[in-house]
Structure formats: C-alpha cells, structure tokens
Amino acid sequence: MSEPNPFGGRITHLTPAEVKAGMEDGRILLIDVREPDEIRAERIPGAAVMALSAFDAAALPDAQGKQIVFSCRSGQRSQRAAAIAQASGQQLEQHMQGGILGWKQAGFPTERG
C-alpha cells in the first residue's frame, strides 16, 4: 500500500520475501542504489546497480515490462531514489523495506560484487 514518502512523493514498502519472489518469477527488476564500495563488498544476486550519488532517473535500465524496485543498505536511500524518480516524472514508488540488511535477515543469499 502506498503512503507518503518522507523524501517526497509516495512510497510502497515491499518485504524482502516479496522482492525475492518477484525477481524469481521475472516480475521485479531490483535496483541497488548503494555506493560502489558497498556493492563490491556484498550485493544481492541479480540486482542492477545505480549509486544514489550519481542517480539519474533518465538513465535507469530498461525494465522490459518488470516493476522497478529500489534497494539500499537499510531502506532510506531507496526511498530517496524513489522520490528523485517521481520528481523527474516517473511513477516509481516501490522499495525493499530493510534493504540488504533485511534481505540477509530473511536468510536470502548475497554475493561479492
């Protein structure tokens, strides 16, 4: 369910389990907005990368019909990315609640970037 995003626009919180299921069945394109050093240390397999520090909504990868969901370390930067995307006219409001920390807490795998 959509609610006001603290950084502007709207936000919809998805659980790591919802995101994992959506990635597995091809409905979700996860975009990790953490910085390159964080990605090198650990990442979610299959996630695309676009650091928030260089975020450009016009340069988002082609989702090929999938829902774009933003992710970060804990869930703050992903909400900021959604707000930036909405401010540029894109209707992207989904993020993974808890970020990669929530993903790992749910017992899902990560890999070295």
Q: Model regions: which residues?
A:
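Rhodanese-like catalytic fold shared by cysteine-dependent sulfurtransferases
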Residues: 1-29, 36-69, 76-113
